[in-house]
Amino acid sequence: MKEKIGWIDNLRAVACLMVIMIHTTTWYVTNSKAVGEHTWDVSNLLNSASRVCVPLFFMISGFLFFGERSAQGRHFLRIVLCLAFYSLVGLAYITWLTPISEAISIKHLLQKPVFYHLWFFFAIIPIYMLSPLIQVKAVRAGYLAVVTLVLAVLANPNTIDQSVGPFHWLPLNLYLSGDSFYYVLYALFGRAIGMMNTDRRGISWLAGVVFFASVAGIAMGTKKQMAINGAFADTWYLYCGPVVFIAAVSLLVLFKNCLNRPLPVLTLISRNSLPIYGFHALFIHFMRTHHLDHTDQPFIDIPLVFVITLMGSLLLALGLRRIDKRHLVS
């Protein structure tokens, strides 16, 4: 069990870092006309490599709660308290440090998160609610491969339309709709892969190759789609998209096989990942909107914004943990 917790902690920490990287590079990928092509390519690559972060969070939750152990009342309480607490933090930030109307944020509180990154707390609630009903069985790798091919690729509503003349053949219509189905599927895969013996000869290399190929596919697909549309399009960035799904599965296998021992820095980030997630967007938004960044020097700006955001969020997280002795929101 310690081995399993080791790779889970490392994976959670890297997913947390990826979230920060996505929001750090978003300005560049959505403002292609304001940045050079080389800068946009690098930002797009970093963003593409980080798109698996949200799927990984769902997979981790599935691994933890879709087995013998299910989410308990204290887990539901913690999610609700986190949503309330970080919404209040976001509301305070909006009120005091932005011209955004807090009244609108309050009015739509149950339909739209106060701050954009808090949507995840809403999305994870159904996973927790379903967990007492689900206990994933051990399955073969071949079965998961078929499920991935059919549900995550061929019948995925986010798969780009393909036709031969008047004959439309992709995506298949299996009446799948909505992101929530794929969030549950990620959780199911997290548990299934977590129980599977994946440490076989060549599997880790294959997982690594598939992950890097998927990242390249996301990056190149995004650039091609931007050329077609004449503006940035997130078609290939979607968390429930087929290539992101494959990338997330391959990275999970890679971490499970190769990073199953505790690493001090990643352990620290993992332990504080919840408040880091809750605070990080405020740092990035403040720097971007108060001209404290250096977008004219992107290769200084990106690592600087990333490090300041990580360190600032980590310091707040450590401070919050000293106050929140029961770790209800930290």
Where are each of the predicted segments found?
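Juxtamembrane loop-transmembrane helix junctions in multi-pass integral membrane proteins
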Residues: E3-G6, T24, H38-L45, A71, ...
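Alpha-helical transmembrane segments and terminal signal-anchor/GPI-anchor hydrophobic tails
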Residues: T198-T267, N272, P298-I300
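C-terminal "closing" transmembrane helix and its immediate cytosolic amphipathic cap
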Residues: K256-S270, A281-S330
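Kinked, hydrophobic transmembrane alpha-helices enriched for aromatic residues
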Residues: E3-G36, M59-G62, R78-T98, A123, ...
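Membrane-interface helix-boundary motifs at transmembrane edges
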Residues: K2-I5, F66-L77, L130-Y143, A192-L206, ...
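Interfacial loop-to-helix transition and helix-capping segments at the boundaries
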Residues: V42-C53, K107-A123, I160-Y186, A219-V249, ...
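Hydrophobic alpha-helical segments with transmembrane-like composition
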Residues: F57-M59, L64-F66, Y93-M195
